């Protein structure tokens, strides 16, 4: 019996010996890597790093995650009920009683909206208003005393300024990406000409749509809207345009865009000679749609528009921007050149609506 016990103990010792040898000592560990000092960066970089991290911490409480359910479509050859379609996006709180900004494409045609706050609370949301032309929407939840993000002045930003893009990419937890303003004049959409996106290299991933683009002062200067397919370029709706549209979305549920009913173009060198112009400046009227505001106001093809209610018109996008944001029914003075002579006509701004293409008077 004693012999058997000694044999078992000897076997256990052989088994445990290599395991004991496999455990590295502190001396062995020290050879595998080098410990970094507590503060290896230059003081200026450490300070900047801390400022960014502190800024991100201040912004996060007003960031929200938006979940949406839409009606699905059943296969044509199948009688089974349609599966609902689900998607996610981001948003941020602009009013402490639960008013949230997001993208129109995030909540468009939603049957059900759920908003999750940074503290984990969940609320059912309802769409207050949206505009697909600019891709902007307002959602409201029944809550009060919420943290908000202030809207800054996007006209004051400069190319090269640092920005943070916040959101819930891929439906995950909050994320923050860092970059710069790459460009200020990126055309917004064909549907809403005259307005510009903010272009940034801060990553805007799927699910970040509707989140804020924030400057180093903690002010929202844009609403993240889309990214290029390769993901290296992102675009945001400027905050000044957001401030222009939010009152209409909140009160009417939609944006009423101004409309003239003209086709326009830039002035080319051949137009300068043909129309007896002093310079290639202004907006050339290529055609006038019959029965539309421009036609009723007396505008004609080959008119060169140079000012609207005193606002200079140097290029087509100037006219598009001014007309789009002028209240419906406003009577405006249009200064123009016709046959080399300066004239002034009055036009009443109409309402833009989706319409079939009308013939244009040449």
PLM ranges: what are they?
Residues 18-20:
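C-terminal motif of bacterial Sec signal peptides marking the signal peptidase cleavage site
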Residues 1-9:
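Bacterial N-terminal signal peptides that target proteins for export
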Residues 308-313, 339:
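Short strand-turn-strand beta-turns centered on an Asx-Gly dipeptide
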Residues 22-281, 286-290, 295-297, 316-320, ...:
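Serine-dependent protease modules
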Residues 12-16:
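Gram-negative bacterial Sec-dependent N-terminal signal peptides
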Residues 345-347:
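Edge beta-strands of extracellular beta-sandwich domains
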Residues 302:
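Conserved catalytic motifs of ABC-family nucleotide-binding domains
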